[in-house]
């Protein structure tokens, strides 16, 4: 079971990010994700769910297209703090992506996106520093601790159940009613084994 299946089983209309294997930020990443959002957007704002680097992309996308984004949920994403020290895989990322982690190939927005944001983080992550995934109070609307390792956030059933439930609770809190799940799409950008 993975995060997309867990969301679909809970009634969400789920759409993968459609960019294949995530090899880091590229000059056209946000443009391609913007097009993907346009394909999914049908007049109802879209919930963006992103794991690890995918969560950082989701936040950037929300900065650029807030009128199309319902909320952003990040799963163990290192969006806060010093990008040089907030993850144990910085050197690997830089080799794979071909650029310094602090110099992505597109301008990076600062601060919290202008939409509701929910951050999932774990003390046991092992890849991303807990404080980097939790964020500061001015960077996120709600931060929820999950008891899992980094990959467990998108694969481990107890974590998946908790994440789906917390997303629904969060949306109920900000919208004043339980989410009409079928009325919203979800883009999940994460490391995929094959192109969609």
What is the meaning of each model-derived region?
Residues 2, 9, 13-17, 26-116, ...:
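Serine-dependent carboxylesterase/thioesterase catalytic core
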Residues 3, 129-136:
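Short alpha-helix in the alpha/beta-hydrolase fold that links the catalytic acid
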Residues 26, 149-158:
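Catalytic histidine-centered segment of alpha/beta-hydrolase-like enzymes
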Residues 30, 155-168:
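Post-His helix in hydrolase/transferase enzymes
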Residues 37, 163-175:
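Short, hydrophobic alpha-helical segments
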Residues 138-153:
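Catalytic histidine neighborhood in serine/cysteine hydrolases
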Residues 173-196:
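Alpha/beta-hydrolase-fold serine-hydrolase catalytic core, especially in secreted/extracellular enzymes
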């Amino acid at each position: 079971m993975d995060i997309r299946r867990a969301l679909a089983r809970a009634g969400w209309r789920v759409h993968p990010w459609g960019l294949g294997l995530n090899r880091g930020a590229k000059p056209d990443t946000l443009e391609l994700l913007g097009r993907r959002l346009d394909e999914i957007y049908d007049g109802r704002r879209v919930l963006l769910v992103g794991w690890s680097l995918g969560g950082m992309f989701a936040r950037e996308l929300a900065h650029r297209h807030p009128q199309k984004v319902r909320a952003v949920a990040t799963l163990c994403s290192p969006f806060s703090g010093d990008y040089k020290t907030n993850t144990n895989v910085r050197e690997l990322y830089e080799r794979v992506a071909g650029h310094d982690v602090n110099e992505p190939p597109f301008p990076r927005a600062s601060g919290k996106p202008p939409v509701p944001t929910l951050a999932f983080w774990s003390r046991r992550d092992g890849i991303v520093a807990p404080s980097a995934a939790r964020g500061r109070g001015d960077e996120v609307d709600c931060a929820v601790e999950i008891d899992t390792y980094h990959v467990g956030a998108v694969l481990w059933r107890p974590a998946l159940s908790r994440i789906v439930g917390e997303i629904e609770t969060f949306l109920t809190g900000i919208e004043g009613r339980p989410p009409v799940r079928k009325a919203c799409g979800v883009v999940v950008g994460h490391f995929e084994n094959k192109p969609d």
